[in-house]
Amino acid sequence: MTSRKEPLRVILMVIVLVILAPSCRKKDPVYILEGQVRSHATGQALSGVTVSVEQRTVGGNVFSGAFTPAASGSTISDGTYRLEWPREQLAEVQLLAAKASYIPATITLDPEDFLPDEVVYQNVRLQPEAFVEVTLTNTGEAAVEDLIRFRFTQASFDCACCNGDWKEIWGADADTTFSCRIYGDIWLKYWAEITAESGNLLIIDSLWCPAFVSTPLVIEY
């Protein structure tokens, strides 16, 4: 009787081992990044923000030349996110956050902060976007020598129109309109120097630029 039960017992043990084997397998180590994204202007938690990690790695003593995607996801209703990706030898790592109507953010992270299966925390503040539409108009009979020089000053952010360079417009070309994407809910200082037959004029002023809308700025001379 014992000899008949022995093969059955072996079969049952094999089945149990097959079932338990996957649960006993050691999980591959991962990096974990968590945080929350809020509006810089209001402090409100932002849902639906696309968050992603890019990395440059070292493998076989070879340094990867470009950033490659490592993980991506989006924030939930309370603005939080969690990203996981396989462990590699990190050389550089950065977090990207983007949402419609907000200025994208790129944050450089310290590779040495990342340890296998340990959480690294990084919160993000996104600036709401706005636009300013500038119109420079010579309302008189424009002379060739007429000149207006215009620039935004003291802008503490990257903006195609806000780098401090002068925009110079001569004579008949003075009817000009251009638009810039800027941070919302800020005061934006501007400077205009006008040289014309009707007289010279210096304008130094500021413009309030609400978030999510386009604010007009018209200078006539």
Please identify what each model-predicted range represents.
Residues 1-24:
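Sec-dependent bacterial lipoprotein signal peptides
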Residues 20-32, 36-41, 118-129:
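Beta-strand-rich domain onsets/edges
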Residues 33-39, 79, 132-139:
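A short, amphipathic beta-strand motif
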Residues 42-63, 140-160:
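Short, ordered, surface-exposed loop/turn motifs in non-cytosolic proteins
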Residues 59-80, 158-174:
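Short, acidic Ser/Thr/Gly-rich low-complexity loop/linker segments typical of extracellular
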Residues 77-93, 168-191, 209, 219:
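Short Pro-Gly-centered beta-turn/loop motif in secreted/extracellular proteins
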Residues 86-115, 193-202:
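A short, solvent-exposed loop/turn motif at the edges and junctions
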Residues 110-129, 133, 200-221:
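Extracellular beta-sheet/turn segments enriched in Thr/Pro/Gly and aliphatic residues
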